[in-house]
Amino acid sequence: AVGYVDEKGNITGWLNELAFMPVDANPDAMEDEWSGDIGCGVKYFSQDGVIKLAPRAGIQLDESLSPAEKLKVVQKCMEEDQEGAKEVYRSIGTYLGHALAYYYDLYHCKHVLLLGRVMSGKGGDLILEEAKRVLADEDPECDGKLFPSLPDEKTRRVGQSAAAASLPEV
C-alpha cells in the first residue's frame, strides 16, 4: 500500500495499492493469485520475484522450503557475493527503475522509501543502485525529481508494518 503526502507535507487521506499496478505488459507475465491480474509489481518486487529469478540465475531452491526460506537462501548467496544472486537483484532493480519512472508519471512522487524483506541486506543496496542507474540512463526526465532511498536495515526488514504503525491517529 502506498500513502501520499502532498508537497506541503500533509497526509492526503487517499491510498492506492501500487503493488497491483502493472509493471509488465507481456501476456505471459506472472499472474497474481490474489487479484488474478498479470504483470503486477507484487510479483516482481517481493519474494515471489526473487524466487522466480533464482533458478534462472543458477540458484537452486529446495521446493519444500517456504517462500520466506527461499528468499533467505538467495539473500545468503548475495551476502557471499555469488554472481547469480547479484543477477537476481540487478534484474529486480531494473524492473523497479522502470516502474518508478511509471509511478512518477502517474503520481508525481518525489521521495520513495523502499521497504520489505527483499530490500534487506546487500540485495536491497544493489536493487536501489540498479534502479537509480536505470532512472538516470533511461528516464532522464526523473533526474533531480525522483529520489528512491532505503532506510536503516531494521526498518527495511519490518517494512510496511513499521510504516503503518508509525502513522499518526487521525
Language model regions located:
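Short beta-strand scaffold segments in enzyme catalytic cores
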Residues: 1-5
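ATP-binding/phosphotransfer module of carbohydrate and carboxylate kinases, centering on a glycine-rich
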Residues: 6-11, 25-170
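Acidic, glycine-rich loop-and-beta core segments that form the ion-binding/anion-interacting portion
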Residues: 11-23
